[in-house]
Amino acid sequence: MDELAAVTEIAAPDVGANQHRWLIAIAVMLGTGREMVDTSIVNVALPHMQGSFSASVDEITWVVTSYLVANGIMIPLTGWISARFGRKRYFLFSVTTFVIASACCGAAQSLDQMVIFRLLQGFAGAAMLPSSQAIMMETFPPEEQQLAMATWSMGLMVAPVLGPTLGGWITDNWSWRWNFYINVPIGILAILMVYTFLEDPDYLRPKRGAKVDYLGIGMLVMGLGLLQLVCDRGQRAVQIWLVERRHSQS
């Protein structure tokens, strides 16, 4: 019986020992909330961005498409990357990269620059959603996990709803560029809080030397990227093909 208890204790993660758990919750929700807001905040600013970059309606939609494609590629890889490099380290890297990419998006001088920086922003932001959920479950004891996850879920549901309203207000009163600059101070606060209070659980450390399936990762990235691209832009391609076919038959 004692041996079984010992094995169970080793196998199960040490959950709920962190006395700063609500500060950690605020930190991860700051990062994740900004990522969720950014999925919708730029939609209302697209006409203003279109004028700044002298882009067509079809071209400016790549600002949204690039972000969604990068998100779709990176989300499935988050668990493996967290296990290999550490959840705290990866989350800090993601938030830091997201902040830098946001500042670059705000300073972009062409559509090409904006699309590249939005790709970088999407790659970085993708890690925050699954990582923050895992961090919440590992930080809170079992008796508080339901409350913690309810709070986390509420924040994630509110963030995309606030995005268009906040984006419209910022664009009208300041500039569309501030839809990205606003991420910088919030992101820096999240970085400082995560660095100060968050620690990796012990059960993740033995997994950092695992073998890497580079072929599998490459196929996953290619497949998910193309699938996301088809889902987002496929209808447009079909419409163009139908128009060209109609002209060729007439």
Give the label of every model feature segment.
Residues 172-250:
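Hydrophobic transmembrane-helix bundles of small-molecule transporters
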